[in-house]
From Swiss-Prot:
Transmembrane domains' residue ranges: 3-23, 44-64, 79-99, 103-123, 129-149
GO terms for biological process, alphabetical: 5-aminolevulinic acid import across plasma membrane; enucleate erythrocyte differentiation; import across plasma membrane; intracellular cholesterol transport; lipid droplet organization
Taxonomic source organism: Mus musculus
Protein name: Translocator protein 2
UniProt-listed PANTHER family: PERIPHERAL-TYPE BENZODIAZEPINE RECEPTOR (PTHR10057), TRANSLOCATOR PROTEIN 2 (PTHR10057:SF4)
Amino acid sequence: MQLQGPVFVGVPLLGPILICMLIHQPSSRCEDERKLPWCPPHKVILLVWVTIYSVMGYASYLVWKELGGGFRWPLALPLGLYSFQLALSWTFLVLFLAADSPGLALLDLLLLYGLVASLVFIWQPINKLAALLLLPYLAWLTVTTAITYRLWRDSLCPTYQP
């Protein structure tokens, strides 16, 4: 892996690190007595997100490298969509952890799910491994969407319900 590889792996981690530094009092809705029994513990959630962000960063590096690197036109769609989904992923963290807005977080997740699924199809002809590395991300988004939906539906956080 060239010097750019660690940069591609590290950039996705910057958003959550900054968000955690800026959020002084994260939401405690998943820690009270009404917590979903099938919701993973916070440490597991944190570990999964860190792993997912690192793996998707490596996958984006594979696509970038396969298309010749640099900032050329063939990279615009595959890495442009990747950048947009990364921003949506960071937005979800803000909506879910800081804004106590499960309705908006759910809408964000649905858009994010569609973007990641699109990335799998767009990246597959470029680099099959990169596309396959996004599949655990889709699986985790499914779990996260189910948790967020239940929190919204069961009115654990009644504010901002659509």
